[in-house]
Swiss-Prot record:
PANTHER family, alphabetized: RIBOSOMAL PROTEIN S19P FAMILY MEMBER (PTHR11880), SMALL RIBOSOMAL SUBUNIT PROTEIN US19M (PTHR11880:SF67)
GO molecular function, one term: structural constituent of ribosome
Keywords: Mitochondrion, Ribonucleoprotein, Ribosomal protein
Protein name in the entry: Small ribosomal subunit protein uS19m
InterPro entries with a match to the protein in the record: Ribosomal_uS19 (IPR002222), Ribosomal_uS19_bac-type (IPR005732), Ribosomal_uS19_CS (IPR020934), Ribosomal_uS19_SF (IPR023575)
Family in the record: Belongs to the universal ribosomal protein uS19 family.
Any one biological process term the GO annotation gives: translation
NCBIfam families per UniProt: rpsS_bact (TIGR01050)
Coiled-coil residue windows: none
Transcription listed as a keyword: no
Organism: Petunia hybrida
PROSITE patterns given in the database record: RIBOSOMAL_S19 (PS00323)
Keyword Ion transport: no
Gene3D superfamilies assigned: 30s Ribosomal Protein S19, Chain A (3.30.860.10)
């Protein structure tokens, strides 16, 4: 279900629109614009998306069209939750 009004269209930064015409400029390109939508012209390109610290390499496929670039470069680390308490660890105050 689209969140943006249809009459507004999808948002794409101006420099990405210029690269849409010249596909060879988009290959392995650094992208800081996480808010831009992925267009069908970008399919089968490798881009590097900035996550706030480093650039994450990502291949654009047909399934990613219509989504934002920022959805594919996570900004937070995944830390698995610790469920069991080992024998040397304390439980905390009671």
């Amino acid at each position: 279900m689209p969140r943006r009004s249809i009459w507004k269209g999808s948002f794409v930064d101006a420099f990405l629109l210029r690269m849409k015409k010249k596909r060879d400029l988009l290959f392995n390109r650094k992208i800081w614009s996480r808010r831009s939508s992925i267009l069908p012209e970008f399919v089968d390109c490798f881009v590097r998306i900035y996550n706030g610290k480093t650039f994450v390499r990502c291949k654009i496929t047909e399934g990613k069209v219509g989504h934002k670039f920022g959805e594919f470069a996570f900004t937070r680390k995944r830390r698995p939750s610790r469920t069991n308490i080992g024998p040397g660890r304390k439980r905390g105050k009671k």
